[in-house]
Amino acid sequence: MASEDIQKKIKEEAPVTWQKSVMLYLHDLVYLLAVVMIVFMLLFRIVIVSGSSMYSTLLDGDWLLVTGSVLYQEPKHGDIIVASKDSFNDGEPIIKRVIATEGQTVDIDFEAGIVFVDGVPLEEDYTYTPTNAQEGIVFPITIADGCIFVMGDNRNGSKDSRHPSIGMIDTREVLGRAVFLLFPGTDKQENREFDRIGALK
């Protein structure tokens, strides 16, 4: 009789124990996901490309993983950065490539389409077109302390540091560096090339 009572008690308690285990597991999982999301938001952000100023490196609709300012402290030549400048497009984020940093001098031969930094012509295999479009800034120009000079890879279809509404960008206006293409946008023929997914150069 006692044995039957024990077995009955075990059967009655088993579902409760299982349910509690599941609830504890779900509680821990939700807590872990919340922590991961908070850390991710502090260290990274996802930005969607709008427009063709970085063509053909980046396409309209590309999803980019961007390191936040916590991880990205010092912009350097060649970095693809995301910045927000109040004087341009109501502070909407812009995506450009760093051409020069503080103390460097930028000059552009618009006829030849060549960019010079400290007198040295840049080898720019990432550009879609030569730099022929002059937007209003007078060159040569020396980059002020705490600032960077940026341009889009689609040089004749980009509003960037050549334009007075953008000019030099204060490094405090830099939101982060684009490091990885998560999901591809579409090209001019509306094709989506998934083999573009990967680290950005």
PLM regions with names:
Residues 1-201:
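Extended hydrophobic leader/signal-anchor segments used for secretion and membrane insertion
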